[in-house]
Every structure is written in C-alpha cells, then in structure tokens.
C-alpha cells in the first residue's frame, strides 16, 4: 500500500465532534474509537488544530479512545481576549472529564508540549504519560534571550476570496519543505473558515500578543509521569543542544527518546508512519 493509499484509508475512520464549555468559551474536540477504552489525547501546536491528527489518530483506535483537542483560539474552538498555559490546562482537564477519562497518555506537538508539561504540574492525576513531539519545553540559559518562536510569522488577518485560494496560501510555520502535498492539503482544508468578506485562518492572530508562558525547568525536573521525546533528526527547531539540555534537566532515559530520520519540525507530516511506529513503541511501554 502506498503512503497516499494509507492516508485515504486512515481518514475514512471519521471522528465525532464535541464541545465543552471552559471559562465561558466553547472548546471543540474530536473523538475516535470506543469511549470505554483507555484515553489517548493529542494536543496540537501553535496555529494548528485537531484535524492535524486526522491521519494519525486512527492508528490507535483498536487500543484507545482517541481524542484531539482544539485549544481556544484554534480550530473550531472559540477565541479569548487573552491566553495562558493555565487556561489551556483547564481546557485539557475539561475535555478529559467530558470524555470520562481518568488518566490519559498525552501526545503533544511543538507549543502543545510546553502547555501539556505545565498541565502535569496542575492536574498530575490526569497524565499517565506525556510524549513530546519536536517540542521545546525548556531552553539552555544562554539561548533564552535570542530565541524566536516564529509566532510573528502567522498572518491571521489575510482575507481570501474562496477556500481554494486560502488553501493555496497555506504554509507550514516554521517554514520547511514537505513532499506529502496531500497531507498539507488536508490540513489546509480545515485551517480556514468563511467570515465577513471572505475566508480567514481559524487561528486567533492576537494570541501571539497575549499568550503567557513561563519557565518550566522545575516542572520538568519533578514531572509526575514518564516523559517521552520523539523528534525530527533534521529539525530546524529541536536541535541537539536543546535535546541534550532537556534530557539532562529532566533526567529522561535514552530508551524514551526516538529521533525520526529525514524529518524536520513537522515530523508527522514528513513521515507519519515512522512517527506512528515510534509512538506505539513508547506509549506501549508505559
């Protein structure tokens, strides 16, 4: 079976769509599989959404009740006046409670990783494990001042005449090549909504100005659950220096680390099947 045929089969496994209210805003999430199975929660990165996982989640439905959240300001969730890691932690908890999930394995990409790690310190009982996908949760002290997270590259104020024009404009942030155009097209299809005057990104452009984060060094050092790391060996974000520092501070054993050859920051768009294999191995050992 070709990768495209695999993708076509995967997205035939359709999720159900749900909403839960958190701090007066409707938070959207998707669910695949039987709800009485152990929970597996996917958390997207900045300016992404739950449908990024449409072709990943079905691989786990035999063993898990799989959930993917749209954090506020993203996807089909409502926008807020301001954002913080604590607000997102409340949203994660609310989705777990709405699905009656007592303890979940969490898989989080990019900014979703720092959000999830912080949530482990607030609601430790909800986390069975946390797998970080090319996610910077702490920085070496000499890198903090000069670090750029690319949030300024998001232009949520652009208006397009139609969905096709909007989809053609879609780019991965941070920029990187990707040979799997059908995956990008699927993600782009779910990244825009029709508004006044045309089609716009679903992502809230003001998040970059209001999002509040914090240093997570102490949280990583005392994480209440196993931490796994899956990263792109060609990642332009998650460098070897950051990996080594994260392993040192978190005292994370080497057997919980998997690098995916030939992939960059958006590793599960570059090579989804290898990422699925890595995730199965790591969460299966928890």
Describe each region flagged by the PLM.
Residues 1-40, 62-64, 101-102, 256, ...:
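Alpha/beta-hydrolase fold catalytic core
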Residues 23, 67-107, 277:
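Active-site loop/oxyanion-hole signature of alpha/beta-hydrolase fold enzymes
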Residues 28-76:
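Conserved HGGG/HGGXW glycine-rich cap/lid loop of the alpha/beta-hydrolase fold
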Residues 118-121, 128-161:
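Flexible "cap/lid" loop of the alpha/beta hydrolase fold
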Residues 159-214:
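Conserved alpha/beta-hydrolase catalytic His-Asp/Glu region
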Residues 222-263:
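Conserved loop-alpha-helix segment in the C-terminal half of the alpha/beta-hydrolase fold
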Residues 260-272:
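Catalytic histidine-centered segment of alpha/beta-hydrolase-like enzymes
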Residues 269-281:
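Post-His helix in hydrolase/transferase enzymes
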């Amino acid at each position: 079976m070709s990768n495209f045929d695999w993708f076509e089969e995967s997205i035939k496994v359709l999720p159900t769509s749900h909403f839960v209210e958190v701090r007066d805003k409707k938070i959207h999430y998707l669910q695949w599989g039987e709800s009485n199975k152990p929970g597996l929660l996917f958390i997207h990165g900045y300016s992404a959404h739950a449908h990024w996982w449409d072709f990943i989640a079905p691989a786990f439905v035999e063993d898990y009740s799989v959930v993917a959240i749209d954090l506020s300001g993203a996807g089909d969730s409502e926008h807020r006046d301001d954002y913080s890691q604590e607000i997102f932690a409340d949203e994660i908890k609310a989705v777990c409670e709405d699905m009656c999930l007592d303890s979940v394995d969490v898989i989080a990409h990019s900014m979703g990783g720092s959000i999830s790690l912080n949530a482990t310190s607030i609601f430790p009982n909800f986390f069975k494990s946390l797998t970080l996908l090319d996610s910077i949760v702490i920085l070496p002290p000499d890198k903090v001042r000069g670090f750029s997270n690319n949030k300024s590259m998001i232009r949520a104020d652009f208006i397009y005449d139609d969905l096709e024009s909007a989809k053609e404009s879609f780019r991965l942030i941070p920029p990187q090549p990707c040979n799997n155009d059908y995956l990008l097209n699927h993600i782009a299809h779910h990244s825009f909504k029709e508004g006044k005057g045309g089609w716009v990104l679903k992502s809230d452009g003001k998040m970059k100005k209001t999002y509040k984060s914090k240093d997570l060094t102490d949280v990583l050092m005392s994480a209440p659950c196993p931490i796994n790391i899956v990263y792109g060996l060609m990642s332009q974000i998650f460098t070897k220096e950051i990996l080594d520092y994260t392993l040192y501070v978190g005292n994370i054993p080497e057997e919980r680390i998997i690098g995916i050859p030939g992939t960059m920051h958006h590793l599960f768009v570059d090579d989804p099947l290898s990422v699925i294999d890595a995730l199965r191995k790591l969460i299966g050992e928890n």
